[in-house]
């Protein structure tokens, strides 16, 4: 289960890295935070809630 989540996060990080190269540095940081924060929050709440 955790391996699947880690693989999924790695793929999303790679996608985010590719997008960062195309965008402005400041804008890309905000986009990564917007995309990553809900994933981490859901992961933690799922692990702590069960």
UniProtKB/Swiss-Prot annotation:
Highest taxon, organism lineage: Eukaryota
Please give the tissue specificity annotation from the record for this chain.
Answer: Expressed by the skin glands.
Q: Which residues form the propeptide?
A: 11-35
Q: Where are the stretches annotated Disordered?
A: 12-31
InterPro entries named in the record? Frog_antimicrobial_propeptide
Signal peptide (UniProt feature, chain positions): 1-10
The chain residues annotated with the modification Leucine amide are 48
Member of which family? Belongs to the frog skin active peptide (FSAP) family. Temporin subfamily.
Q: What does this protein do?
A: Amphipathic alpha-helical peptide with no antimicrobial activity. Does not display anti-leishmania activity. Does not show hemolytic activity (LC(50)>116 uM).
Q: What is this protein called?
A: Temporin-SHb
Native organism is: Pelophylax saharicus (Sahara frog)
């Amino acid at each position: 289960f955790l391996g699947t989540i880690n693989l999924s996060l790695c793929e999303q990080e790679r996608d985010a890295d590719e997008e960062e190269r195309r965008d402005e540095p400041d804008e890309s940081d905000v986009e990564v935070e917007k995309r990553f924060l809900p994933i981490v929050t859901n992961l933690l709440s799922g692990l702590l809630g069960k």
